[in-house]
Amino acid sequence: MSNPCGAVHQPLRRTILPSTKEMILLTNPETGYEKAHQQVEQIFREVFPARGMAVREGQIRLCHTMLDALFGRDVALCDAGVGLGKTYAYLVACVLWQLQKPRPMQRPVVISTASITLQNAILEEYIPFLSKVLIQNGYIQDPICAVLRKGKERFVCDVRL
């Protein structure tokens, strides 16, 4: 089955993930972990405010926490109030994390939401805006590719998760 991004989707399967030490070795040594965290600061303190967005310390901390979890192959359970900017925090973390991996190592990031409204907003507002801003500021060259997967076979099962 193909999608608009041109990738072929295979059924989910369990794989053995590299350890944190191995993961750090797989990252691009020129840009790596530290640069990704520096880019979080630049994006949220300079790039977004230049577009009229407010600097939110909680949003920046949340993005750093999520980036740490992604680099460490850990789980981050984060709770944040309405209006903090959670969506941009996790989208920026995911984009920066993917940028640190060589192309063959990049895999899709799965985001599960509680509402159809948020799904639509991510696809129609957040990702197009983020793509445009990150391209204009030299962080990425191509637009962020996203696909919405619907249907009962796509639901996250609490028991199997």
Positions of predicted regions on the chain:
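A substrate-engagement module of RecA-like helicase motors
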Residues: 16-45, 49, 54-57, 101-161
